[in-house]
């Protein structure tokens, strides 16, 4: 059995420097790429003074993750923080799948996905479908969409978001609804 990708996680007092050309520069994330196409990411949280981790790809199938010791007693208890460390969307881009920011509902044996920017009403819409149509929320924040050559399926994702609902369930995609505010 071969390994798809491996990580080495190290707790440090001082984060190493990121390497490569700066591609993305947000308050909570800086993404760099070196000449070999390998990424480094400084990962933070909005409102914090400094990043809490550095993700650095050292080969096509390996990354080092450095986590600041100061952060382990704080926000690091949340699963979303740990998943950010792994840059899973990089691994998924190598496969016929993608992560969709959405409320993922099960309705009549199929996945119904409500997607929109944060604060638009995905969770509210999911609650209304549960209340009036008998649907069930599988994940209130994300779904992993996968194409098998014939159809798209929605899969559970291990981050719950504010809904605190996340189940590992695979269903054929029935519809994707893009919400907007009036």
Model regions: which residues?
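Hydrophobic positions on the alpha1 helix immediately C-terminal to the Walker A/P-loop
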Residues: 125
């Amino acid at each position: 059995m071969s390994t798809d990708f491996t990580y080495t996680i190290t707790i440090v007092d001082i984060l190493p420097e990121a390497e490569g050309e700066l591609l993305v520069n947000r308050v909570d994330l800086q993404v760099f790429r070196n000449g070999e196409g390998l990424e480094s990411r400084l990962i933070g949280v909005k409102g914090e003074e400094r990043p809490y981790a550095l993700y650095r790809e050292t080969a096509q199938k390996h990354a080092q993750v450095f986590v600041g010791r100061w952060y382990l007693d704080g926000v690091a208890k949340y699963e979303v923080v740990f998943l950010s460390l792994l840059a899973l969307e990089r691994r998924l881009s190598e496969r016929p799948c993608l992560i969709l920011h959405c409320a993922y509902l099960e309705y009549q044996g199929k996945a119904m996905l409500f997607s929109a920017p944060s604060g638009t009403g995905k969770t509210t819409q999911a609650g209304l479908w549960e209340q009036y149509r008998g649907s069930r929320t599988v994940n209130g924040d994300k779904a992993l969409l996968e194409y098998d050559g014939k159809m798209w399926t929605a899969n559970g994702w291990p981050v719950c978001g504010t809904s605190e609902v996340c189940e590992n369930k695979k269903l054929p995609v029935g519809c994707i609804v893009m919400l907007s505010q009036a």
